[in-house]
Design a protein with these regions (language model features):
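Helical subdomain adjoining the active site within ATP-dependent kinase catalytic cores
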Residues: 2-49, 76-79, 317-413
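Activation segment
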Residues: 229, 283, 287-289, 294-305, ...
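Catalytic-loop of the protein kinase fold
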Residues: 259-292, 297
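Conserved structural core of kinase catalytic domains
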Residues: 132, 137-197, 210-255, 300-302
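Amphipathic alpha-helical interaction motifs in eukaryotic regulatory proteins
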Residues: 196, 200-206, 215, 256-263, ...
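ATP-binding glycine-rich phosphate-binding loop
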Residues: 23-176, 192-199, 205-209
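Protein kinase-like catalytic core scaffold
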Residues: 104, 210, 222, 289-292
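Conserved beta-strand elements of beta-rich interaction domains across eukaryotes
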Residues: 95-97, 109-114, 219-221, 228-231, ...
Length: 413
């Protein structure tokens, strides 16, 4: 055997080993960063501080008694920080789900230096209670935030304060009539909650099947349904999820349904700007849920984020996974988004590529469907044979072809 051939083969083996080590090491680093634990001591302190605020009437909400008085909502552990947000896992005994003990998630961006919002400065009487003008000011401020989330049904809401909170404000005032500033406490608590984008979106859109259940609030903290990604949406390196293609196809269909809802189910499109599989989870009803709605933006809000003073290339008009288009003649980002949620989901979740270690959600399809499915996924992720950063939209026709094909695969499996 020629020496040159052996040298080439040895170099190939060494190259493959280096690639393997880099991929494996990168995955370990990614897991370490993503799963870095918050401080247990700090988390317990935050819960103690919250209960202290409840005892002094600075915090209120329907979950405060369960957390602080009856101990029906018990802190279990903390998990990783996401964008400055505290995410704590708790055990909920008969409060979140009547007659059952379930896991729940306690979330808040407070207290965090990055979590800043304008103080709620309302006109008050000398004893701390709101004047009629102060009450009207709060109503108008809260209504403007509510308008950013819903336009079609806002006029049907008779009590904005109670709609945005976990308690009936008037009842809370009656039950705390000896506490003159009870109304102001309610307003401050609501204000601290609705300044958190995730809370506002999920509270307002609880009727959507892909939104985790909102169990309630205490102070600036909100308690939600526990819906972990599981091994299918967040598989471990090498071991994978061990799931069948049929199981993964069902989840893919749920995600496609969410895409359709975000594109067409609201008064204007809602854009996903941080698309990755672990940002979805499986709820108690076995439906796929969106876990991180901080990265969801209504189209009007999205265009404000893309509104640069000027742009010289398309990258200037990007906002994370939401990609814009620069009109070079005017130097302005266009008001029409150049790609949609469907394209991003196909590229970042469904197909195989190096960043997911060639294990997209729809990897290894049944052999009899490969020739039909793989080109369709390619067309979905890279419309019109796009290369690099994709800025072309994926057509609705591709959506329906993919949706119907996955249903057929499940039916015939």
């Amino acid at each position: 055997m020629p020496r040159a051939y052996l040298v080439r083969k040895l170099k190939l083996v060494i190259f493959c080993c280096i690639v393997f080590i880099l991929l494996y090491g990168g995955n370990i680093l990614r897991q370490a960063i993503r799963d870095r634990k918050c401080s247990e001591e700090e988390s317990k302190f935050l819960m103690d501080e919250l209960c202290h605020n409840y005892s002094t009437h600075a915090a209120a909400g329907n979950m405060c008694p369960a957390l602080c008085t009856f101990k029906k909502l018990k802190y279990n552990k903390c998990t990783n920080y996401r964008g400055g947000k505290k995410v704590l896992i708790a055990q909920c005994d008969g409060v979140c789900k009547e007659g059952s003990t379930v896991k729940a998630v306690i979330k808040s961006k407070h207290p965090k230096e990055e979590f800043r919002f304008e103080p709620l400065d309302l006109e008050k009487h000398a004893n701390g209670s709101l004047t009629q003008m102060g009450y009207k000011m709060a109503h108008n401020i809260f209504k403007s935030l509510l308008d950013s989330q819903m336009l079609e049904e806002r006029d049907k809401i008779s009590d904005i304060f109670s709609f945005l909170w976990s308690l009936d404000v008037e009842q809370y005032k009656r039950e705390n009539r000896d506490f003159k500033s009870a109304e102001m406490t309610a307003m401050q608590n609501i204000w601290g909650l609705i300044n958190q984008d995730e809370y506002l979106f999920m509270k307002v859109h609880q009727k959507q099947s892909f939104v985790p259940k909102m169990y309630g609030t205490c102070g600036f903290y909100y308690v939600m349904e526990y819906a972990p990604p599981g091994d299918i949406l967040d598989p471990q390196f090498f071991s994978g999820s061990g799931s069948s293609f049929e199981e993964r196809a069902k989840i893919a269909i749920d995600i496609l349904d969410i895409v359709q809802s975000l594109d067409y189910g609201f008064y204007e499109p809602v854009h996903m700007c941080d698309v990755k599989a672990e940002n979805f989870g499986i709820g108690e009803d076995q439906q796929v849920k969106i876990l991180d709605s901080d990265s969801l933006f209504f189209h009007t809000s999205m265009m404000k984020n893309l509104a640069q003073p000027s742009c010289t290339n398309h990258d200037d008009c990007d906002f994370f996974d939401c990609r814009g288009w620069c009109e070079l003649e005017t130097g302005k980002c266009t008001k029409q988004r150049s790609n949609n949620n469907l394209q991003t989901v196909c590229e970042d979740i469904l197909i195989d590529k190096p960043t997911n270690f060639y294990a997209g959600l729809l990897h290894n399809p049944p052999s009899e469907f490969k020739e039909e499915l793989l080109p369709l996924l390619e067309e979905c992720a890279f419309p019109a044979h796009s290369k690099g950063i994709v800025r072309k939209p994926t057509s609705d026709d591709v959506y329906w072809k993919l949706h119907n094909l996955l249903k057929r695969i499940i039916r015939e499996s």
